[in-house]
Curated annotation (Swiss-Prot):
This is Large ribosomal subunit protein bL33B. GO terms for biological process: translation. It holds the Pfam family Ribosomal_L33. It comes from Staphylococcus aureus (strain USA300 / TCH1516). Signal peptide: none annotated. GO terms for cellular component: cytoplasm; ribonucleoprotein complex; ribosome. Keywords: Ribonucleoprotein, Ribosomal protein.
Length: 52
């Protein structure tokens, strides 16, 4: 059975730190994901985007 879920890294758009690792289903979400998450370096919530 082929596993569709893959691990992705989320990077802060303001400072560039890669703060989070999560999984996504490539079949349901083929585009890159974006989430508002907490950035410990900036001490605030910022937009985090999926990186390669």
């Amino acid at each position: 059975m082929f596993n569709v879920r893959v691990n992705v890294t989320l990077a802060c758009t303001e400072c560039g730190d890669r703060n989070y690792i999560t999984t996504k289903n490539k079949r349901n979400n083929p585009e890159r994901i974006e989430m508002k998450k907490y950035c410990p370096r900036l001490n605030k919530y910022t937009l985090h985007r999926e990186t390669k």
